Structures are given as structure tokens and as C-alpha cells.
Regions:
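Flexible, surface-exposed loop regions and adjacent strand-edge segments
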Residues: 124-128, 184-186
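A long, amphipathic alpha-helix that forms part
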Residues: 89-100, 126-166, 177
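Active-site-proximal alpha/beta segments of enzymes that process anionic O-linked groups
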Residues: 1-126
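Short beta-strand segments
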Residues: 49-51, 106-113, 139, 145, ...
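Short glycine/proline-rich turn/loop motifs
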Residues: 15-18, 128-133, 201-205
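A short beta-strand-to-alpha-helix junction
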Residues: 27-34, 132-144, 185-191, 203-212
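Membrane-interface soluble catalytic domains
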Residues: 38, 55, 154-160, 183-186, ...
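Histidine-centered active-site microenvironments of extracellular/periplasmic hydrolases
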Residues: 161-164, 168-204
Length: 212
């Protein structure tokens, strides 16, 4: 468990991808000195940002580091409208097309995950907890995210050299109870988020464990 960079995507993602350690980081973000995509390119990585979030909700891309992203795909490139989100699973075929055995890759799969309205992008078979109440609907989205993580992880495990690092976290949390649900509040559920870091390379895993 870790802390999100902020309570809302518009602040959290620019802060996260620029390693902002505290509030009022706009000057650091603007400089790009600590931008993850820029740093990845400096180390010879090809960079990817594949997003399931509607294009008109991602005006923050310049702050995330758009000019250092080699491959940017949003729902509009896959036939969705400018204001349409798409199911997270649509990111998986894009990931599968990347030849992970050729070159170095810094890949971000930006999911919708557990946003309201909970379950709106799920198929009927994904609603394993039913839809009797808001908690059940929210839990369905968590289950779907778990499945997606498993799919990506299993794909990485097929790589013969074992030279990869998997990272998963969330840009913010959700406060979900039977009688109320929201985000952006000061409730701990709004800023406590999961963090998963795994590499089959023992040295990389040890470094990750020491850092986090």
C-alpha cells in the first residue's frame, strides 16, 4: 500500500510521471528534468502510452510528457468518440503487438479501472459479484483489474531473458460505502493505493524493495 500523488487524475498523473516529491511542483514538471518518459528515452528505451481514458479528458498529456512519448494511442485512434472511454481490455491487443524481445521498452497501459459509474464498461460476464448495490458494482471493477494485471504479468513471464520490471499502481483511490461513494475527498481510501513492483531479476527486485 502506498500514497497517491494527488486525489484527482489531473494532478496525480503529471506529479507521478515527473517524480514530484511535494506540492507546487509545476516548475519541475515544466522543466521535464525528472520526466519518466524523457529519462527512459535517454537510456535508449522506446516509450509507449496507451490510454483507455477519453481523449477530451486527457488535456494533461503535455504535463505527463507527450513530447517524449514515441507511441501514443487513445480511444479515438480505435474508433471511439472524442468523449468516449473504452474498456481496459482493449489495451491488451496493443500490448501484445509490441515485440518485447527487440530493443528496450517503457510501456504505460493507462486504465480506467474503478471509475464511476462503476461497471459501465464491463461485459455481463465480468459482473461476478452482481449489481445489487454500489459495493458489488465497485468490486466487479476490481476483479476485472485483477484479471488484466494477470494477463499482462503472464505475457511478461513468457519473455525468455527475464529482463523486465512490472509495476502497478493507481493515480488515486475511491471512497466506497453502501450509502456514499466518491473520490477527491480527504478520506484515506481516496489516497491509499496499491503498489506492485516485480522483476524476475533478483538484483532489480532487491533495488525495488530497498527503494519502496
Amino acid at each position: 500500500q502506498s500514497y497517491s500523488a494527488a486525489l484527482m487524475t489531473a494532478v496525480s498523473l503529471p506529479s507521478f510521471f515527473n517524480a514530484i516529491p511535494h506540492a507546487n511542483g509545476y516548475e519541475q514538471i515544466s522543466s521535464g528534468d525528472t520526466n519518466m518518459f524523457r529519462l527512459a528515452k535517454e537510456q535508449g528505451y522506446e516509450t509507449y502510452f496507451y490510454s483507455a481514458q477519453a481523449e477530451n479528458e486527457m488535456a494533461i498529456l503535455n504535463l505527463i510528457g507527450k513530447k517524449w512519448i514515441d507511441h501514443l494511442i487513445q480511444p479515438t485512434q480505435l474508433g471511439y468518440g472524442n468523449g468516449d472511454n473504452m474498456p481496459d481490455e482493449k489495451l491488451l491487443p496493443l500490448f501484445d503487438k509490441i515485440n518485447l524481445q527487440q530493443g528496450k521498452h517503457f510501456i504505460v497501459l493507462h486504465q480506467r479501472g474503478s471509475h464511476v459509474p462503476y461497471g459501465a464498461l464491463l461485459q455481463p460476464q465480468d459482473k461476478v459479484f452482481g449489481e445489487a448495490n454500489i459495493v458489488d458494482k465497485y468490486d466487479n471493477t476490481i476483479h476485472k483489474t485483477d484479471q488484466m494485471i494477470q494477463t499482462v504479468f503472464e505475457q511478461l513471464q513468457k519473455q525468455p531473458d527475464g529482463n523486465w520490471l512490472f509495476a502497478y499502481t493507481s493515480d488515486h483511490g475511491q471512497y466506497v460505502r453502501q450509502d456514499t461513494y466518491n473520490q477527491g475527498t480527504v478520506q484515506p481510501d481516496s489516497y491509499l493505493v496499491p503498489l506492485v513492483l516485480y522483476s524476475p531479476d533478483k538484483a532489480v527486485q532487491q533495488a525495488a524493495n530497498q527503494a519502496f
